């Protein structure tokens, strides 16, 4: 009988689904229950391939643009990342029943940007170019109204209309530390710049990054369960590396684990991005249990009791 090597596993808590992701997935499942298949979803409802494939198997059809929707008698759901204002307008023009599953914390950023614009301030957006959330936020205002700022170097070369009449908002899934540095650089260059009353980085992003900071320096390796196109999952891997973990990997399924890298470790931390379901954490844990004698301990750094109700279009339908 082969003796398995011992492995101490620290499970980060909180990890996995946030309230906005739960709400978005529930919205698709509730729409399927009420209206039947197909239910169309513009863009991946959340950035997790397992979640998307599971919803496809239940009758969801994912599209990138509304002109890909052939049947306007069936609902279309907007993803948790938010959409430009032109998308609901296009849906209304085509008489499409749209259900907005934008995370309420992303909607908060949209409203902040609109308010700054209404008050005559130029808006700077700290975020990553091309991310659906950034595209959606920029699309809340007339073209050219928002300047995207991606790096501290961008700040040094920014050309603004009036440095005394500026505001900023941020993408919700950024690195907390990077964003803090960006905001500090903005306020140094533009002392009069106006920011949000409460930071735009969402509670789940902050909590998951803080949990990783606690465990990363004391383990041989760390796995982030999540998809490669998930911004918050990518940031967790970066946070682990910056916090002193020499081996940090982003893994979606057990089959993706590069086992040769983990052959000689004695301690491992596992977390999951905000769009990664717990079933994938369990799958990866089971795969490690086949190869190691596990001692598992959960490390809790925050308690989350956040809940967001279903989109109002679905609440009306269930009354």
Swiss-Prot record:
<feature type="binding site">
    <location>
        <position position="230"/>
    </location>
    <ligand>
        <name>dimethylallyl diphosphate</name>
    </ligand>
</feature>
<feature type="active site" description="Proton donor">
    <location>
        <position position="133"/>
    </location>
</feature>
<feature type="binding site">
    <location>
        <position position="232"/>
    </location>
    <ligand>
        <name>isopentenyl diphosphate</name>
    </ligand>
</feature>
<feature type="binding site">
    <location>
        <position position="275"/>
    </location>
    <ligand>
        <name>(2E)-4-hydroxy-3-methylbut-2-enyl diphosphate</name>
    </ligand>
</feature>
<dbReference type="GO" id="GO:0046872">
    <property type="term" value="F:metal ion binding"/>
</dbReference>
<feature type="binding site">
    <location>
        <position position="275"/>
    </location>
    <ligand>
        <name>isopentenyl diphosphate</name>
    </ligand>
</feature>
<feature type="binding site">
    <location>
        <position position="47"/>
    </location>
    <ligand>
        <name>dimethylallyl diphosphate</name>
    </ligand>
</feature>
<feature type="binding site">
    <location>
        <position position="231"/>
    </location>
    <ligand>
        <name>(2E)-4-hydroxy-3-methylbut-2-enyl diphosphate</name>
    </ligand>
</feature>
<dbReference type="GO" id="GO:0050992">
    <property type="term" value="P:dimethylallyl diphosphate biosynthetic process"/>
</dbReference>
<keyword id="KW-0411">Iron-sulfur</keyword>
<feature type="binding site">
    <location>
        <position position="230"/>
    </location>
    <ligand>
        <name>(2E)-4-hydroxy-3-methylbut-2-enyl diphosphate</name>
    </ligand>
</feature>
<comment type="similarity">
    <text>Belongs to the IspH family.</text>
</comment>
<feature type="binding site">
    <location>
        <position position="232"/>
    </location>
    <ligand>
        <name>dimethylallyl diphosphate</name>
    </ligand>
</feature>
<dbReference type="InterPro" id="IPR003451">
    <property type="entry name" value="LytB/IspH"/>
</dbReference>
<comment type="pathway">
    <text>Isoprenoid biosynthesis; dimethylallyl diphosphate biosynthesis; dimethylallyl diphosphate from (2E)-4-hydroxy-3-methylbutenyl diphosphate: step 1/1.</text>
</comment>
<dbReference type="GO" id="GO:0019288">
    <property type="term" value="P:isopentenyl diphosphate biosynthetic process, methylerythritol 4-phosphate pathway"/>
</dbReference>
<comment type="function">
    <text>Catalyzes the conversion of 1-hydroxy-2-methyl-2-(E)-butenyl 4-diphosphate (HMBPP) into a mixture of isopentenyl diphosphate (IPP) and dimethylallyl diphosphate (DMAPP). Acts in the terminal step of the DOXP/MEP pathway for isoprenoid precursor biosynthesis.</text>
</comment>
<comment type="pathway">
    <text>Isoprenoid biosynthesis; isopentenyl diphosphate biosynthesis via DXP pathway; isopentenyl diphosphate from 1-deoxy-D-xylulose 5-phosphate: step 6/6.</text>
</comment>
<dbReference type="GO" id="GO:0051745">
    <property type="term" value="F:4-hydroxy-3-methylbut-2-enyl diphosphate reductase activity"/>
</dbReference>
<keyword id="KW-0560">Oxidoreductase</keyword>
<feature type="binding site">
    <location>
        <position position="131"/>
    </location>
    <ligand>
        <name>isopentenyl diphosphate</name>
    </ligand>
</feature>
<dbReference type="Pfam" id="PF02401">
    <property type="entry name" value="LYTB"/>
</dbReference>
<feature type="binding site">
    <location>
        <position position="81"/>
    </location>
    <ligand>
        <name>dimethylallyl diphosphate</name>
    </ligand>
</feature>
<protein>
    <recommendedName>
        <fullName>4-hydroxy-3-methylbut-2-enyl diphosphate reductase</fullName>
        <ecNumber>1.17.7.4</ecNumber>
    </recommendedName>
</protein>
<feature type="binding site">
    <location>
        <position position="231"/>
    </location>
    <ligand>
        <name>isopentenyl diphosphate</name>
    </ligand>
</feature>
<feature type="binding site">
    <location>
        <position position="231"/>
    </location>
    <ligand>
        <name>dimethylallyl diphosphate</name>
    </ligand>
</feature>
<feature type="binding site">
    <location>
        <position position="103"/>
    </location>
    <ligand>
        <name>[4Fe-4S] cluster</name>
    </ligand>
</feature>
<feature type="binding site">
    <location>
        <position position="81"/>
    </location>
    <ligand>
        <name>(2E)-4-hydroxy-3-methylbut-2-enyl diphosphate</name>
    </ligand>
</feature>
<feature type="binding site">
    <location>
        <position position="47"/>
    </location>
    <ligand>
        <name>isopentenyl diphosphate</name>
    </ligand>
</feature>
<feature type="binding site">
    <location>
        <position position="47"/>
    </location>
    <ligand>
        <name>(2E)-4-hydroxy-3-methylbut-2-enyl diphosphate</name>
    </ligand>
</feature>
<feature type="binding site">
    <location>
        <position position="131"/>
    </location>
    <ligand>
        <name>dimethylallyl diphosphate</name>
    </ligand>
</feature>
<feature type="binding site">
    <location>
        <position position="81"/>
    </location>
    <ligand>
        <name>isopentenyl diphosphate</name>
    </ligand>
</feature>
<keyword id="KW-0408">Iron</keyword>
<feature type="binding site">
    <location>
        <position position="230"/>
    </location>
    <ligand>
        <name>isopentenyl diphosphate</name>
    </ligand>
</feature>
<feature type="binding site">
    <location>
        <position position="202"/>
    </location>
    <ligand>
        <name>[4Fe-4S] cluster</name>
    </ligand>
</feature>
<keyword id="KW-0479">Metal-binding</keyword>
<feature type="binding site">
    <location>
        <position position="232"/>
    </location>
    <ligand>
        <name>(2E)-4-hydroxy-3-methylbut-2-enyl diphosphate</name>
    </ligand>
</feature>
<dbReference type="GO" id="GO:0051539">
    <property type="term" value="F:4 iron, 4 sulfur cluster binding"/>
</dbReference>
<feature type="binding site">
    <location>
        <position position="172"/>
    </location>
    <ligand>
        <name>(2E)-4-hydroxy-3-methylbut-2-enyl diphosphate</name>
    </ligand>
</feature>
<keyword id="KW-0414">Isoprene biosynthesis</keyword>
<feature type="binding site">
    <location>
        <position position="18"/>
    </location>
    <ligand>
        <name>[4Fe-4S] cluster</name>
    </ligand>
</feature>
<dbReference type="GO" id="GO:0016114">
    <property type="term" value="P:terpenoid biosynthetic process"/>
</dbReference>
């Amino acid at each position: 009988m082969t003796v398995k090597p011992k492995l101490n596993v620290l499970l980060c808590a909180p990890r996995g689904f946030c309230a906005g992701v739960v709400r978005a997935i529930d919205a698709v499942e509730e729409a399927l229950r009420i209206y039947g298949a197909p239910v169309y979803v513009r863009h991946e409802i959340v950035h997790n391939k397992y979640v998307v494939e599971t919803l496809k198997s239940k009758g969801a059809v994912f599209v990138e643009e509304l002109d890909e929707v052939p049947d306007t008698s069936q609902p279309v759901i907007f993803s948790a990342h938010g959409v430009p204002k032109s998308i609901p307008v296009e849906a209304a023009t085509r008489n499409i029943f749209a259900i907005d599953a934008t995370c309420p914390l992303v909607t908060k950023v949209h409203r902040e940007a609109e308010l700054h614009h209404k008050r005559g301030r130029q808006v700077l957006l700290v975020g990553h170019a091309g991310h659906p959330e950034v595209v959606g936020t920029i699309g809340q205002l007339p073209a050219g109204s928002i300047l995207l700022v991606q790096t501290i170097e961008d700040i040094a070369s920014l050309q603004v209309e009036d440095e005394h009449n500026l505001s900023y908002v941020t993408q919700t899934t950024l690195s907390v530390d990077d964003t803090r540095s960006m905001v500090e650089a903005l306020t140094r260059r533009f002392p009069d710049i106006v920011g949000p009353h409460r930071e735009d980085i969402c509670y789940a992003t902050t909590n998951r990054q803080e949990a990783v900071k606690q465990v990363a320096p004391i383990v041989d390796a760390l796995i982030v369960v999540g998809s490669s196109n998930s911004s918050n999952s990518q940031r967790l891997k970066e946070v682990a590396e910056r916090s002193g973990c020499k081996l940090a990997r982003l893994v979606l399924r057990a089959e993706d684990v590069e086992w040769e890298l983990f052959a000689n470790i004695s301690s491992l931390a596992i977390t999951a991005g905000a769009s990664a379901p717990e079933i994938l954490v369990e799958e990866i844990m089971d795969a490690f249990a086949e190869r190691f004698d596990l001692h598992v301990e959960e490390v809790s750094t925050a308690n989350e009791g956040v809940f967001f109700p279903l989109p109002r279009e679905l609440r009306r339908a269930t009354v």
